[in-house]
Amino acid sequence: MDKTLSREEAKQLMQLLCLDMSCWGNLPLMRRQYLVKCKEYHPDKGGNEESMKLLNSLYLKLQDSVSSVHDLNEEEDNIWQSSQIPTYGTPDWDEWWSQFNTYWEEELRCNESMPSSPKRSAPEEEPSCSQATPPKKKHAFDASLEFPKELLEFVSHAVFSNKCITCFVVHTTREKGEVLYKKLLQKYQCSFISKHAFYNTVLIFFLTPHKHRVSAINNFCKGHCTVSFLFCKGVNNPYGLYSRMCRQPFNLCEENIPGGLKENEFNPEDLFGEPKEPSLSWNQIANFALEFDIDDVYYLLGSYIRFATKPEECEKCSKNDDATHKRVHVQNHENAVLLQESKSQKNACTQAIDRVIAERRYNCVTLTRKKLLTKRFKKLFNEMDKIVVGERKILLYMASIAWYTGLNKKIDELVVRFLKLIVDNKPKHRYWLFKGPINSGKTTLATALLNLCGGKALNINIPSEKLPFELGVALDQYMVVFEDVKGQIGIEKQLPSGNGVNNLDNLRDYLDGCVEVNLEKKHVNKRSQIFPPGIVTMNEYCIPETVAVRFEKTVMFTIKRNLRESLEKTPQLLSQRILHSGIAMLLLLIWYRPVSDFDEEIQSNVVYWKEVLDNYIGLTEFATMQMNVTNGKNILEKWFE
């Protein structure tokens, strides 16, 4: 203690601790008094701040000094061992003695040299009466310093892990090993437990019927080892660890199963806990959304939960009308039951929608526009197999073709030219303008073309500050329709005014398609892409020259009374949205165009549907439909009363 603090500092510290100097060196007493005085001197308790600072500095200095002295003593003890002392009087002993003295403090060294004594003649060597100090016995190996190196390859080395496992090994003293062996067996109902001696310590190996974290086992054991050392580890190779602890330097003490364990006796439940309960497969939901191209969270959730009903109790499955539905229902029934019970239904469906958007983004970047259109047609053909079933449905779709023929005699050429426009997507030749009076068929045709190719309709009659998010809807879309654009000045005074034409004039880069533009959605980062081509529909507004030159073609519409009357008398075309569907446009192309006009990948589908249409309606019947349209009659008057 004399090497820790100076005499004056020691007196100051003892005065602050209110202890007599006779107690100097009684570290436990000084520690207790220090904690008491900290509460007394602390400024928050009304004490003296200066006294508190002085007490802390002196006490911390004392602690550091005591630690340094202990370290020095340990170094001195470890300099040499008695077994290493050479024989006294030999040159080796002189060298060892010189090395031994180098560790002592400088002031204790003595560099004096003794005067040499006169040599005396010795006819005979007398036997030496001195001998070296006998070597001390080696201390027994202390196995409590670290976990046995022989077992490191079998255990987990994770420091912080939430993984739950069923196999553990605990390393502690012999005394605590006796206690923990019984406590662990009782607490965790171990399916197997064994105790192994390792020098002066004990290892306990055990398997639990249920999964636990290593930290939970460690905390339980610490409650019984407040002073004794403790190592607790999870086991990666249970049988390898157990068999190694049955060989030297380990000794098997006891185990709850006579004869121990053999490698083939380990069941999966022993190693991995209880059989894993089936969990909700988010990937299966995503695959379903990808197959049917669903990008609406709530529609996906509603559709998928329907599969929770048993297939044998499902009306659609029992009718056998839709083979695809029955296949998908059987595949997804078990997962749908889990989704129904899950608390993360929306999260699972949101991730599935993200997969759909990611797939769409990938296709937009990697596939050509012709390939994308072919893929869209394939999807429509799949829908036709489910929707266009039976004579009544086919006649309704043929009636829509007759109506479009009445709208434009060369409707097929118009559609083919438009498809070529959006497939080529040439800069400054990407947009058509549909212009005409109210109820002249502009929106009907534009919507059908939009559904044929796939895309979104946009409203740009809104204030300019709201435009960025409206335009962001066009992200990854094949085409767009700027619907019912309003201008400031119209040929007819009763037309309402709006910001549409003015906003369109400010979107020249969007219409031209020469450079990439930034598109953004809420909660999504901006992305640069060429804005998709499309159609602009408007009434008879005046268009500035800067906007007009950006339209590759302007299609003028006029009011045809017979078209309106035939629709009124054939309400199914509107109520069932047949006239606005992409299927109607695709059937129109199949009816009018030769097979060679279609891509080779879908020519077989085109041939099939041409045969289907020919079986239900011939040229004479179709001519009758056209005549009914021209006369403003019910298009299906001959077939439906």
UniProtKB/Swiss-Prot annotation:
Entries under PROSITE patterns matching the protein? SF3_HELICASE_1, T_AG_OBD, ZF_LTAG_D1
Zn finger region (T-ag D1-type) = 277-369
Map motif Nuclear localization signal onto the chain. 134-141
Q: Which residues form the J domain?
A: 12-80
Residues the entry annotates as binding ATP: G436, P437, I438, N439, S440, G441, K442, T443
GO molecular function terms attached to this record: ATP binding; ATP hydrolysis activity; DNA replication origin binding; helicase activity; zinc ion binding
Residues covered by region (Disordered): 114-136
* Compartment(s) where it occurs, according to its Swiss-Prot or TrEMBL record: Host nucleus
Q: According to the UniProt entry, which residues carry Phosphothreonine?
A: T133
Please write the reaction equations for the catalytic activity of this protein.
Couples ATP hydrolysis with the unwinding of duplex DNA by translocating in the 3'-5' direction; ATP + H2O = ADP + phosphate + H(+)
What Pfam family does this protein match (any one)? T_Ag_DNA_bind
In this entry, the residue ranges of the DNA-binding region are 148-263
- Cofactor or coenzyme needed: Mg(2+)
Q: Which Gene3D superfamilies match?
A: 3.40.1310.20, DnaJ domain, Large T antigen, SV40, domain 3, P-loop containing nucleotide triphosphate hydrolases, Zinc finger, large T-antigen D1 domain
Instruction: Tell me where in this chain the PTM Phosphoserine is found.
Output: S117
**GO annotation terms (biological process):** DNA replication; symbiont-mediated perturbation of host cell cycle G1/S transition checkpoint; symbiont-mediated suppression of host innate immune response; symbiont-mediated suppression of host JAK-STAT cascade via inhibition of JAK1 activity; symbiont-mediated suppression of host type I interferon-mediated signaling pathway
Record's comment on post-translational modification: Phosphorylated on both serine and threonine residues. Small t antigen inhibits the dephosphorylation by the AC form of PP2A.
Chain positions recorded as Zn(2+) binding sites: C314, C317, H325, H329
Q: What is its EC number?
A: 5.6.2.4
According to the UniProt record, list the residues that bear N-acetylmethionine: M1
Q: Report quaternary structure and partners.
A: Forms homohexamers in the presence of ATP. Interacts with host HDAC1. Interacts (via LXCXE domain) with host RB1; the interaction induces the aberrant dissociation of RB1-E2F1 complex thereby disrupting RB1's activity. Interacts (via LXCXE domain) with host pRB-related proteins RBL1 and RBL2. Interacts (via C-terminus) with host TOP1 and POLA1 allowing DNA replication. Interacts with host TP53, inhibiting TP53 binding to DNA. Interacts with host preinitiation complex components TBP, TFIIA and TFIID to regulate transcription initiation.
Can you quote the domain comment? The J domain is essential for multiple viral activities, including virion assembly, viral DNA replication, transformation and transcriptional activation.
State the name under which the record lists this protein.
Answer: Large T antigen
The major lineage groups are: Viruses, Monodnaviria, Shotokuvirae, Cossaviricota, Papovaviricetes
